[in-house]
């Protein structure tokens, strides 16, 4: 597996309003708001994307419902690595014994993703993010 870049990172919020006050009001970060309370920016130098991802939306992405299962460590943050080949990266992680929550799924917005919870409690994605790869088509799909 070859990691190409960090596609994005940020907190997973259980109290979106408190997170909004910290990041928008106190730190002055301007976010775009989409899909309910999902807030993101591609304008912070040094990051492709920084986003506050509501836990309910992370649960929907991983499990198909708004509730995070009690038997899976609840993540505090998310981190996505764009890789050269998501299918191969997924296979490698499974061979190493990692339990994937999502395998090789294409999200409604076009990103291909496999996800797992890291030992530190991060929701880690192995991704192919088309809009971050100008000139490339169907990479990792």
What residue ranges belong to the model's regions?
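Conserved beta-strand in the GNAT
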Residues: 50-53, 115, 124-127
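A short local loop/turn or secondary-structure capping micro-motif enriched for an aromatic residue
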Residues: 57-61, 132-135
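Positions that flank functional sites
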Residues: 38-39, 108-109, 136
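Core segments of cupin and vicinal oxygen chelate
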Residues: 4, 10-57
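Vicinal oxygen chelate
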Residues: 13-17, 72-123
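N-terminal beta-strand motif that seeds the catalytic metal site of vicinal oxygen chelate
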Residues: 1-20, 33, 76-81, 127-141
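Aromatic- and Gly/Pro-rich amphipathic surface segment
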Residues: 59-74
């Amino acid at each position: 597996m070859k990691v190409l870049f960090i596609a994005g990172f940020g907190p997973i919020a259980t109290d979106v309003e408190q997170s909004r006050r910290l990041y928008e009001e106190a730190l002055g970060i301007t976010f775009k708001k989409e899909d309910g309370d999902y807030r993101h920016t591609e304008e912070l130098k040094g990051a492709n994307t920084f986003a506050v991802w509501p836990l309910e939306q992370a649960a929907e992405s991983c499990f198909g419902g708004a509730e995070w299962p009690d038997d899976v460590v609840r993540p505090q943050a998310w981190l996505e690595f764009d890789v050269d080949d998501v299918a191969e990266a997924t296979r490698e992680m499974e061979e190493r014994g990692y339990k994937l929550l999502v395998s090789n799924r294409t999200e409604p917005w076009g990103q291909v993703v496999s996800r797992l919870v890291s030992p530190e409690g991060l929701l880690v994605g192995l991704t192919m993010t088309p809009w971050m790869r100008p000139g490339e088509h169907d990479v990792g799909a």
